Amino acid sequence: MEQGKHLAGLILAITLLQGTMAQLKEGKHSVLLDDNREDGSVLLTCGLPDQNIRWFKDGKEICSLNNSRSTCNLGSSSKDPRGIYWCEGSKENSKRLQVYYRMCQNCIELNSATVSGFIFTEIISLFFLAVGVYFIAGQDGVRQSRASDKQTLLSNDQLYQPLKDREDDQYSHLQGNNSRKN
């Protein structure tokens, strides 16, 4: 049992040391990002002491500037300069820096998963709406009459009294002298 614990500890130590070795190969110097400029541009500064510096974005060389400059202007932050940047000198590389600008605070990134989610939700909601309309509209509008719904009708003699003969009053004429006859 003791050997199993030592073996597990050895495997864990080797795994952690491999990650440390990978970081050492990447570079000691960092790339600094300056996005608090008045003109809204994004500026990268390389921390390498070398004079001949080349800049890379996602594996492709960018910023073909003078060989003595250690800065790279990415342009305006509104143009979304996202990617993985690093600088390379004649002898060593810097650490990689991932730049990601999200200009819109309440935006949704439309990738295929988001669009398919919207479509799936729309189909499900339309299905529930159709089922609800089917069950509500499918009910019969005619209901069975009950004994309590029946009313006893009275004859006209008991409920109404006959009208009096009209007299020749102001409202008994439609026009001028024409009197109304019954």
From Swiss-Prot:
Gene3D superfamilies from the UniProt entry:
Immunoglobulins
Where does the record place it?
A: Cell membrane
Would you say which domain of life the source belongs to? Eukaryota
- Any notes on this protein's domains? A di-leucine motif and a tyrosine-based motif are individually sufficient to induce both endocytosis and delivery to lysosomes.
Question: Which InterPro entries does the UniProt record give?
Answer: CD3_esu/gsu/dsu, Ig-like_dom_sf, Ig-like_fold, Ig_4, Ig_sub2, Phos_immunorcpt_sig_ITAM
Subunit record text: The TCR-CD3 complex is composed of a CD3D/CD3E and a CD3G/CD3E heterodimers that preferentially associate with TCRalpha and TCRbeta, respectively, to form TCRalpha/CD3E/CD3G and TCRbeta/CD3G/CD3E trimers. In turn, the hexamer interacts with CD3Z homodimer to form the TCR-CD3 complex. Alternatively, TCRalpha and TCRbeta can be replaced by TCRgamma and TCRdelta.
Q: Name one GO cellular component term.
A: external side of plasma membrane
User: Which residues does the entry place in the Extracellular compartment?
Assistant: 23-116
Alphabetical UniProt keywords: Adaptive immunity, Cell membrane, Disulfide bond, Glycoprotein, Immunity, Immunoglobulin domain, Membrane, Phosphoprotein, Receptor, Signal, Transmembrane, Transmembrane helix
Motif: Di-leucine motif; annotated at 153-154
Q: List the disulfide bonds.
A: C46-C87
| PTM comment | Phosphorylated on Tyr residues after T-cell receptor triggering by LCK in association with CD4/CD8. Phosphorylated also by PKC; leading to the TCR complex down-regulation.
Membrane protein topology class: Single-pass type I membrane protein
Q: What is this protein called?
A: T-cell surface glycoprotein CD3 gamma chain
